[in-house]
Curated annotation (Swiss-Prot):
Protein name: GTPase Era
Signal peptide interval: none
Lineage, top ranks: Bacteria, Bacillati, Bacillota, Bacilli, Lactobacillales
Topology of this chain in the membrane: Peripheral membrane protein
Record region (G5): 150-152
Gene: era
Amino acid sequence: MTFKSGFVAILGRPNVGKSTFLNHVMGQXIAIMXDKAXTTRNKIMGIYTTDKEQIVFIDTPGIHKPKTALGDFMVESAYSTLREVDTVLFMVPADEARGKGDDMIIERLKAAKVPVILVVNKIDKVHPDQLLSQIDDFRNQMDFKEIVPISALQGNNVSRLVDILSENLDEGFQYFPSDQITDHPERFLVSEMVREKVLHLTREEIPHSVAVVVDSMKRDEETDKVHIRATIMVERDSQKGIIIGKGGAMLKKIGSMARRDIELMLGDKVFLETWVKVKKNWRDKKLDLADFGYNEREY
């Protein structure tokens, strides 16, 4: 039997559903999700393998006009995938008109000379007439290999999109073992799970000035638990107070919810300790960015 494989980038503006799509395809949380723009900061691989094929999806940070060194890193991280992949999924929302951000991405896609599939997400939010109008508008901007409307949240048409990708794969190697689902180490996934809970629980009170560093992660033979020490970094003292909460209640809730997700991922009992530290203006300091896991050479 011929084995087929390929690399597929998922590109688009912030908050269009790229991570939701990847998690649905993989059947579990690989990329964190929150209803805030620019939640994804690093490129994250989701490795989808069957007995006939391997599709390596690369979920990228939402492309936006950067205002900080972190923003520069995120946008360059997204565009750099164009040099690495066989196909691009350009994801746009069905419930928002084409904007300047979309046009900026389209110009880069035209120059990249990579086959592009337009994925119109969130079709569950619009009337079919609005969907057709959205598709026509984008169809006039560039030559797409395919146009596929989906609802990543509800799963509508997602399997059809995967089938289309499979049909267009070339014969190739199996790059990763069948049981590997991502390229990131467990520490990265743990830090992302803690960060997701911070964003979810603090809502609009904490902007994207939060990073999480896993200081240590090891099994305690006496308790038979994985002991994890993680530090939540913020830029201001006021943000530290919000995350800790009255009497430490918010930090306890963040830790409890994150621990449950980490236990599901690891298949182990976990003891999670969290601290909050202030590192002023870390998003504009390249040394801090590297320390907190935003390293161009790695991700």
